[in-house]
């Protein structure tokens, strides 16, 4: 099973607003959208190949409550990610934090 990292965060915004912000965040992070479905509130993206990775697949699913679930997983049979998947997810949430109102502190 390829290495992966997944995290969720709920934003005080509607599903459509979070979806549009995710589309922008993917672009700002330098990732490429391969599929985008506004009705299902899902985005599939990819990263480029690099020195330490064959690239990663990124899946974003937005819930009706403004919750964004983001998962980054290695492509192919790569089982060690050297922290790349976590960095991808963190980069997307950092970009979303600038595009959307901040979630309430817990």
Give, region by region, the residue ranges found by the protein language model.
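Ser/Thr-rich, low-complexity intrinsically disordered terminal regions
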Residues: 1-106
């Amino acid at each position: 099973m390829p290495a992966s990292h997944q995290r969720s965060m709920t934003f005080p915004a509607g599903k459509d607003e979070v979806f549009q912000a995710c589309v922008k965040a993917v672009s700002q992070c330098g990732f490429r959208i391969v599929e985008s479905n506004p009705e299902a509130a899902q985005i599939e993206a990819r990263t480029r190949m690099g020195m330490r990775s064959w690239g990663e697949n990124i899946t974003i699913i937005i819930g009706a409550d403004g919750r964004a679930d983001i998962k980054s997983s290695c492509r192919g049979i790569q089982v060690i990610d050297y922290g790349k998947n976590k960095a991808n997810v963190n980069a997307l949430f950092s970009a979303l934090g600038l595009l959307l109102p901040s979630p309430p502190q817990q």
